[in-house]
Amino acid sequence: RIRNEPLIEITQIKGTSETHPLLSSRDEWADFELMEFRVGSPLYSQPKGSYAREALLNGLVFEQQGIANPYAFGFIGSSDTHTGASGVEEDDFVSKLGLLSATPEQRGSVPRGSLSLMGLFGPAANVEIDGENYASGAPPTFGASGLAGVWAEENTRDSIYKALSRKETFGTSGPRMRLRFFAGYDFAPDMLDRNDVVTVAYANGVPMGGELLARREQAPAFLLWALADTNSAPLQRLQVIKGWIDEAGQPREEVIDVACAGGVMPDPSSNRCPDNGATVDLNDCSFSAQTGEAELKVM
């Protein structure tokens, strides 16, 4: 399976499939852009068995039982629009279905008034909110997501597909940030200050998507490095989601902040960055531009 399906799409216009609050109750962002309905149906989906983090943990359980892990996936994001456009910007959203969801009225963003709107299979459904009629159905559940990040040696088809195959990839919900992640046992403490840090990390560790062979009685080091999208919000934190199997054979998960904006350290009791006052104005979606970083890196 991993040969044929090394990657899965962790986010797209029909929602983010990383995790769900019922599966990750201690993750305050587990509800990010979820589409909880079945495709083409108003019925709710069953969270269990539907999300990527749980699949990774289930794969570890299989390994613990001596069964080959079918869920050692890497991740990408993609749009899944049918328009030929990348609908990843909230302020320039082109939606998914061309003429069927081209206007704010069709997407249920503003009242439809007396307009007669068409959906995929006939007249669009309608819902009344505060005395106004809005289009319902699938378009109001769409989100402006996502993008695939690929670390290829060069911008050629052959090189990109080799990177996809080795899972040296990541997904974002739209921002064009750049993210590096390496693991190894022989990282020098001063690596982050070197101009050739990426070259040294490749030489002495494994990149995202790789497998690191465990050493007895020695913990690995992790190198994380993120650059913000210059046309989007600054970075607030770097997080690691740790998954493991406990002594009772049960899967466990922990969310750990490892780097915080402003040079502060995560709280050692909660493993969370302190609130730095960053806000989003829900009236116009503007954000605090001076409360984050253009770059975060840590080892």
Please report, for each region that a protein language model flagged, where it lies by residue.
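C-terminal functional module detector
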Residues: 2-299
